[in-house]
Amino acid sequence: ALEKDGIISKSHPTVSTALIVSKGTRKIKKSQAYNIGLVELQDASSQASVLKLNIDQNGPILDFCAGGGGKSLALSAYLNKPIFAYDANFERMKDLPNRACRSGANIRVIKSNDLKKSHYGLVFCDVPCSGSGSWRRDPEGKWSLTLQDYERLLTLQENILATASQLVKPNGNLVYATCSILKDENKAQIQKFLKNTNDWALKKEKFSIPSELGDGFYFSILKRK
């Protein structure tokens, strides 16, 4: 479908849902495939964090840091289930209903008063981070991040983990993901969280460094006891 619009792509070698575009990148948003919801723009590493969710999803699914909705769309496509999308900044999700409609995804955008404690079988948290895993294609990010901003991000990530964990029902799963390669934002956050609670266990952890095939990323899957 992309080739009809002069866009040349090939399958990604390790992420089954991803395509590597070698020609016509700027044409994608004007292509028929994009406008009828056959393709979305997303780094392969972001897709990989969803594809590796080899877990049982018993109960509603919540994308807790939905932003523009990339992960919500990926979750919907992979799990083929309705997705609840939430973001502390509701305005960030303004385009999500149209994106969901275009792709045929069943995504319901919700506000904070719609959230329910101990209710969701899966809560996915793609938390705000330094973005260090994507500095290969956005090197200015490395120089614009101040120490104060970084420390603020660490506190925010810790708070998101604490809040999101209360929304997961017993035997449910919590996914913590970043596009960072810095330990403080990744493994250290999970270790701190597990140290302060007896209700959770680490099921899976994955770290990937940046390469020509995708950004660096981290994710962990936690299970509530």
Model-derived features: where do they sit?
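S-adenosylmethionine
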Residues: A1-K225
